[in-house]
């Protein structure tokens, strides 16, 4: 007599929400904002009609109010944005500046990133901070009292990976992703490329995927190099995803879905797009951990950068 009972799959995928990860950082921010005799002021510039940008601005305002920062949203026509940024650069009452991208959705957006003063660039997108990140330079001064500012969205993903235990705390700081393979589906200059650099500089082998090709970011065999190198490969997504411990996706299209069958059993999957890049139901058959969004952690990192920059403006750097 045959046994008709079917065993249930015992695989379990844990869903981790950004709000839970952000809690610890919010408490740190509340403690550090009290170190100042005033509430640091963040100005956000909105020059597009993107609903996701509007939602991000609303979240930023809500979080600033809860913690004790000042926040002002300035809605400015695209053609007036550069002058508005320069005005904020020169306003001593403004401690931090951010722009809700995209604005022109072309190379002019990269130019606008450079218009923001490095002293107030909470997004960490100006040339000085980007160069430091790519060259793995972690401080702004020889005395190493001022940490360089990292791009807030890539930094948020790093902090999520730390929270999830992907970073190995036993290994020396700066090498804690050694032995990890990570695939990133996005190579934008704002998130995907800097994220690949950050993770590779921490010791990971990173496959960066876009519509053109797959590149490999690595510090070499045995992480011997001080900073990462980038090499073109002949690989495709289906070659690198199944060998990855972590898959990070940020495709800005409602029509894109990452193929769940390419996810290695037990892998960590993170979506940083405003669209749902993963099909949750099929993904949970493979992934060990799924982080469906990162927005609240990104805002926490934005405000972390604001505290650092405010302390630098006062020449009283704080370590946060």
Curated annotation (Swiss-Prot):
Keywords: Cytoplasm, NAD, Nucleus, One-carbon metabolism, Oxidoreductase, Purine biosynthesis. Catalyzes oxidation of cytoplasmic one-carbon units for purine biosynthesis. Homodimer. It catalyses: (6R)-5,10-methylene-5,6,7,8-tetrahydrofolate + NAD(+) = (6R)-5,10-methenyltetrahydrofolate + NADH. The keyword Nucleus applies. The lineage of its organism: Eukaryota, Fungi, Dikarya, Ascomycota, Taphrinomycotina. CDD domains: NAD_bind_m-THF_DH. GO terms for biological process: folic acid biosynthetic process; purine nucleotide biosynthetic process; tetrahydrofolate interconversion. The active site is at 152. It comes from Schizosaccharomyces pombe (strain 972 / ATCC 24843) (Fission yeast). Signal peptide: none annotated. NAD(+) binds at residues 187-188, 210-211. Its EC number is 1.5.1.15. This is Methylenetetrahydrofolate dehydrogenase [NAD(+)]. Pfam families: THF_DHG_CYH, THF_DHG_CYH_C. PANTHER family: C-1-TETRAHYDROFOLATE SYNTHASE, CYTOPLASMIC-RELATED, METHYLENETETRAHYDROFOLATE DEHYDROGENASE [NAD(+)]. Pathway: One-carbon metabolism; tetrahydrofolate interconversion.
